[in-house]
Amino acid sequence: MNTMNSVLQCKELALYGGSFDPLHKAHLAIIDQTLELLPFVKLIVLPAYQNPFKKPCFLDVQTRFKELERALRGIDRVLLSDFEIKQERAVPTIESVIYFQKLYCPKTLYLVIGADCLRHLSSWTNAKELLKRVELVVFERIGYEEIQFKGRYFPLKGIDAPISSSAIRASLGV
């Protein structure tokens, strides 16, 4: 995992946000595939304090951050950021995008999202402005409906991960 200073030398950044509640192997597969698809990018993993579209998290924010820290240790080109956590509220994606654009001035900023999020992107805060500021990287899951989106995006194909954070929480009765 990199420090903030190492990001300053990067012209391309990618943001991968989420609740990571809990972190599982599909999250890590998405990180690996993003780094493979975009070989010159630094990837910033951005755990949410609270996802604006979901119920409050099952795991507390410190636990989720520590899980990510352990899992990402030693992965080159990845930075774990606590920007959204420090806000102590649900942070719209556009706010995080603007923050990192101002902080690092990347030539290109990619936003890594799931196909399920892409279907509802129009309901996000300032969605049109968001699409002007980022290049989308969209991960599809095997067995899920094909993406119907008229805009441009980079696909991450075949995330064969039947595990989801929601399914894990449901199996625990939460």
Curated annotation (Swiss-Prot):
Gene Ontology biological process: NAD biosynthetic process
Coiled-coil residues: none
Enzyme class: transferase
Stored SUPFAM superfamilies: Nucleotidylyl transferase
InterPro entries noted in UniProt: Cyt_trans-like, NadD/NMNAT, Rossmann-like_a/b/a_fold
Keyword entries, A-Z: ATP-binding, NAD, Nucleotide-binding, Nucleotidyltransferase, Pyridine nucleotide biosynthesis, Transferase
Catalytic activity: nicotinate beta-D-ribonucleotide + ATP + H(+) = deamido-NAD(+) + diphosphate
Domain of life: Bacteria
Pfam families, per database record: CTP_transf_like
GO molecular function: ATP binding; nicotinate-nucleotide adenylyltransferase activity
EC code(s) of this entry: 2.7.7.18
Known pathway: Cofactor biosynthesis; NAD(+) biosynthesis; deamido-NAD(+) from nicotinate D-ribonucleotide: step 1/1
Similarity field: Belongs to the NadD family.
NCBIfam families linked to this entry: cyt_tran_rel, nicotinate (nicotinamide) nucleotide adenylyltransferase
Function: Catalyzes the reversible adenylation of nicotinate mononucleotide (NaMN) to nicotinic acid adenine dinucleotide (NaAD).
Name the record gives this protein: Probable nicotinate-nucleotide adenylyltransferase
Gene label: nadD
